[in-house]
Amino acid sequence: MSNDWIFGACAVPDARMRSAALARQEQLTKPPGALGRLEQLAVQLAAWQRTEHPAVQRVWIAVYAADHGVAAEGVSAFPQAVTGEMVRNFARGGAAIAVLARELGARLEVVNLGVVNDPGDLSRVRRAWIAPSTANICEQPAMTATQLRDALAAGAHSIAQAKGCDTQLFVGGEMGIGNTTAAAALGCALLSQFPQALAGAGTGLDAEGIAHKVTVITRALALHADASTPLERLRRLGGFEIAALVGAYIAAAQAGIPVLVDGFIATAAALVASRLNPGVREWLLFGHRSQERGHAALLRALDAEPLLQLDLRLGEASGAAVAIPLLRSACALHNGMATFAEAGVSDA
């Protein structure tokens, strides 16, 4: 299997349903625009879902876990063993995203793409093993071409499953010690930014730790300066879980499934996906603005206005999950409010 599928055409939102939803908003018992962005969200969901009555009840959350060779450079406040330990925590339902998924009634898929501290086969975890970790991006490309292909395909596999369940919204998350370093390096390469602009605290680095992280990213960018395409930059600087998110976002857009993007790492993947296949951008909604330093720059590059700003920086799809009730409220208001005619209320 080649990577040619990632360049395939994306679905097109339904303009007729968008117009119908806009017309309904104009007839609801409220001043025009009084519900602000909630109105826009309902209209956008109607166009995506090709219905006058959008809903966000069937939600698929996929969390991709993978380790990074660059962790050997000491770029995280936590040891690399944590990635595998968190996979086990996801499976047991103790992680933040597991709690949120239960609260939302969402389907949670956990995918083990390769971790150093491998917990082995676990119930509720899909094993899509590639390698124990990527290579150290300061020494060589993160992935081989085959590994990149497999990681992209792992994300697409999630979408195939989600589509089979008539999913109304896809949310992607990640777990991997060292992945903010990979995401920052990738963002720098794509946006021609200096590492100081995108490198942040990650799991909790102090100022000295962030300065070291900047040095590590600078070394990686120098080594891979000849990478000229988004796909090659992803292969050299990214991670298995970042590539899986890229594959999921592209496959979702091709399948016509709306995507709610999480934080810094997920947005880096969204930027790659949109550069590889520009049609993807039309299917992306952004859940929150992370506290991670580089997230704002990535959002600007995507012309994205996130729904929330709560100073979150956990990852796991947790910030996006917190935004889902907003989407549900938008749909409930759109579908449930009376029109002026139904309520016998005078229009303006």
From Swiss-Prot:
Entry keyword DNA-binding: no
EC class name: transferase
Pathway the protein contributes to: Nucleoside biosynthesis; alpha-ribazole biosynthesis; alpha-ribazole from 5,6-dimethylbenzimidazole: step 1/2
Reaction catalysed by this enzyme: 5,6-dimethylbenzimidazole + nicotinate beta-D-ribonucleotide = alpha-ribazole 5'-phosphate + nicotinate + H(+)
Highest taxon of source: Bacteria
Alphabetical keyword list: Cobalamin biosynthesis, Glycosyltransferase, Transferase
GO molecular function: nicotinate-nucleotide-dimethylbenzimidazole phosphoribosyltransferase activity
Active site: 316 (proton acceptor)
Glycosyltransferase keyword on record: yes
GO terms, biological process: cobalamin biosynthetic process
Membrane-crossing residue ranges in chain numbering: none
EC numbers, comma separated: 2.4.2.21
Protein family (similarity comment): Belongs to the CobT family.
Chain's role: Catalyzes the synthesis of alpha-ribazole-5'-phosphate from nicotinate mononucleotide (NAMN) and 5,6-dimethylbenzimidazole (DMB).
Annotated HAMAP family: CobT (MF_00230)
Protein name (record): Nicotinate-nucleotide--dimethylbenzimidazole phosphoribosyltransferase
Organism: Xanthomonas oryzae pv. oryzae (strain MAFF 311018)
